[in-house]
């Protein structure tokens, strides 16, 4: 958890964190509507957050819980009152929706929109630096939300990746208004608070601050999205403050001129020289058009092939692309001009290091937890760490011996690893195709692009594999029930880089996948999935009934975890070493496979996957 600076109340806050709320399994609002408690989502400040299901309509919500014992102090009551007063009046597509506020004898509750894809902080941990196109996609949404706040004379004052949540469509939602305040025109606030890596110099210098502190934070956010770490970050907080006061940071040379100029304007040490949120949205960075470096291919696919391949994966719920706002449409239009380009991706040389790191992490867990395996665990509710749940995992797969393995990820994107070590993947909307050749060079295409003739055969194979999965395999839908969402929004384009299967094999007990983002997934024959993420240092278990439990490795070391999971972690330790690449290793390896691939003379071979491996 990031360090939060406050000159007053630090000790009180530390004490507040000891007040873990006693939350009953069923709570009732002031209209006696029942809510059923679900997973623990996280904590911050003096509140804990849980998922709840509203039983009268089955809606799933996030519920922030504050123990009343904390509110005995007037400062805490005033802070909570201000937070509720500000948040409940907000209604915007890029702000977490506030629904309701009520209390019982022990706690105060407020119900919020549930953001199922964690936050940009988790995305940053998994992905590191994003492409400029992706950074534009997220930053423009942050600026839209900030513009709405500033129009209402509200300063957020704690904008950071951890407070920028993502819904199932990767739509950014600004949350946590614990430090927010109203601010009149020409008024200056003197409170010294915020998060060190995002705090503006005028706050540190105590010269008075206003709306410009949020603009500064947008600059820090854009910098982190583009380059992976905050601009003023250092090992010591005080050194970070010195760098902020001196405006001591460097924009990497690989930044585009428009990105460089925008960052420098957002991080201007003089507040009055920073752009307004409205001006940020009009910046050239969000309108930049990069000419395609790959010339169009004149040989065009037949229209029938285009429609068949790029049709929505789920025919029951056809995807409808609608602009959210004019500024979103401009970014979407810019996408097509940049999309046809070759990108040399990082080679797989780091895969062995990632697997070695994961093996070491698991070994450390098993060596230190083995003594506690037999003790009963009764406190797993708060030990769950849903914020460490990976964004992607394999939900379906099928193997055709003559061609390769096709698969679908949990958010409905799909891909295929061909026998010649090339890859093909398509996003969940079915309108963006990526081909990765044997040299690990990526080629991007959209629905309107002319695809080279030499890819037509693989596109046809990939299309047939998708059709097979649609027809024959059980759908592994999102763990959240999207049809029960309160506020439907048009799906946004998914710009997160989709991982691919880099290596896989079968045993008599399971199927093991290694993804390009470092994740290792094991699908057991009893329909339990285990997803190990070395970057988030966590393990996620997905039961046959779709129940999800995520534990950080640190959490397991401290509190152990259910005995039924430890044996699976031991199994993973034994099998991960078989995934480590050797000099001549191909992508696909088979170990003790009960259904070893055989030569087939049919058009696509007999699939070796079956529903027993699927959730």
UniProtKB/Swiss-Prot annotation:
Sites where the protein binds ATP: 41-49, 64
Active site: 158
Catalysed reactions, as listed in the record: L-seryl-[protein] + ATP = O-phospho-L-seryl-[protein] + ADP + H(+); L-threonyl-[protein] + ATP = O-phospho-L-threonyl-[protein] + ADP + H(+)
Cellular location(s): Nucleus
Top class in the EC scheme: transferase
Domain annotation Protein kinase: ranges: 35-286
EC numbers, comma separated: 2.7.11.21
Keywords: ATP-binding, Kinase, Nucleotide-binding, Nucleus, Repeat, Serine/threonine-protein kinase, Transferase
GO cellular component: centrosome; cytoplasm; kinetochore; nucleus; spindle pole
KW Nucleus (keyword) present: yes
Domain of life: Eukaryota
Main location per the UniProt record: nucleus
Residue ranges annotated for the POLO box domain, each copy included: 393-471, 500-581
GO molecular function, one term: protein serine/threonine kinase activity
Residue ranges of the region described as Disordered: 1-20
GO BP: mitotic spindle organization
Function, as annotated: May be required for cell division and may have a role during G1 or S phase.
Similarity remark: Belongs to the protein kinase superfamily. Ser/Thr protein kinase family. CDC5/Polo subfamily.
The name this protein goes by in its record: Serine/threonine-protein kinase plk-3
Lineage, uppermost ranks: Eukaryota, Metazoa, Ecdysozoa, Nematoda, Chromadorea
């Amino acid at each position: 958890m990031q360090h939060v600076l406050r000159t007053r109340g630090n000790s009180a806050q530390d004490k507040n964190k000891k007040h873990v709320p006693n939350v009953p399994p069923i709570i009732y609002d002031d209209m006696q509507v029942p809510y059923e408690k679900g997973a623990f989502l996280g904590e911050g400040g003096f509140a804990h957050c849980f998922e709840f299901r509203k039983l009268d309509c089955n809606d799933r919500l996030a519920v922030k819980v504050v123990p009343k014992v904390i509110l005995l102090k007037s400062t805490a009551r005033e802070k909570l009152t201000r937070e509720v007063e500000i948040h409940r009046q907000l209604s915007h597509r890029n702000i977490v929706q506030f629904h309701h506020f009520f209390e019982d004898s022990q706690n105060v509750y407020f119900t919020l929109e549930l953001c199922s894809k964690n936050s940009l902080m988790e995305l940053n941990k998994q992905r590191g630096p994003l492409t400029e196109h992706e950074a534009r996609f997220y930053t423009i949404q942050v600026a839209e939300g900030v513009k709405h706040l500033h129009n209402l004379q509200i300063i957020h004052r704690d904008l950071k990746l951890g407070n920028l949540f993502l819904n199932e469509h990767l739509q950014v939602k600004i949350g946590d208004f614990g430090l927010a305040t109203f601010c009149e025109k020409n008024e200056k606030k003197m409170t010294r608070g915020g998060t060190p890596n995002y705090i503006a110099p005028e706050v540190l210098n105590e010269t008075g601050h206003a709306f410009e502190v949020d603009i500064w934070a947008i600059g820090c956010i854009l910098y982190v999205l583009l380059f992976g770490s905050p601009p003023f970050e250092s090992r010591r907080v005080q050194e970070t403050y010195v760098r902020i006061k001196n405006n001591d940071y460097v924009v990497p040379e690989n930044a585009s001129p428009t990105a460089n100029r925008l960052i420098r304007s957002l991080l201007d040490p003089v507040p009055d020289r920073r752009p307004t949120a409205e001006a940020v949205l009009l910046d050239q960075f969000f309108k930049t058009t990069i000419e395609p470096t790959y010339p169009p291919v004149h040989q065009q696919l037949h229209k029938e092939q285009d429609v068949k391949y790029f049709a929505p994966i789920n025919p029951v719920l056809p995807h409808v692309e609608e602009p959210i706002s004019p500024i979103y449409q401009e970014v979407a239009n810019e996408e097509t001009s940049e999309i046809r380009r070759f990108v040399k991706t990082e080679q797989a040389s780091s895969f062995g290091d990632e697997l070695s790191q994961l093996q070491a992490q698991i070994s450390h867990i098993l060596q230190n937890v083995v003594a506690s395996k037999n003790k009963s665990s009764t406190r797993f509710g708060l030990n769950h760490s849903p914020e460490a749940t990976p964004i992607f995992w394999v939900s379906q797969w099928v193997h055709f011996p003559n061609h390769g393995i096709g698969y679908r990820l949990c958010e409905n994107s799909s891909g295929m690893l061909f026998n010649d070590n090339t890859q093909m993947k398509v996003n969940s909307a079915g309108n963006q195709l990526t081909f990765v050749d044997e040299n690990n060079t990526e080629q991007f295409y959209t629905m309107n692009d002319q695809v080279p003739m030499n890819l037509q055969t693989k596109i046809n194979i990939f299309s047939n594999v998708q059709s097979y999965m649609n027809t024959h395999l059980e759908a592994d839908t999102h763990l959240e029930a999207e049809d029960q969402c309160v506020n439907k929004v048009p799906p946004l384009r998914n710009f997160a880089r989709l991982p691919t299967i880099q290596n896989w094999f079968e045993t008599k007990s399971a199927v093991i996948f290694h993804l390009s983002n470092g994740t290792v997934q094991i699908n057991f024959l009893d329909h339990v999935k285990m997803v190990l993420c070395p970057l988030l240092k966590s393990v996620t278990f997905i039961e046959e009934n779709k129940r999800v439990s995520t534990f950080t490795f640190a959490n397991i070391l401290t509190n152990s975890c259910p005995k039924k999971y430890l044996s699976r972690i031991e199994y993973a330790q034994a099998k991960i070493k078989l995934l480590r690449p050797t000099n001549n290793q191909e992508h696909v390896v088979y170990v003790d496979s009960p259904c070893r691939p055989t030569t087939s003379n049919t058009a696509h071979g007999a699939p070796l996957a079956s529903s027993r491996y699927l959730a």
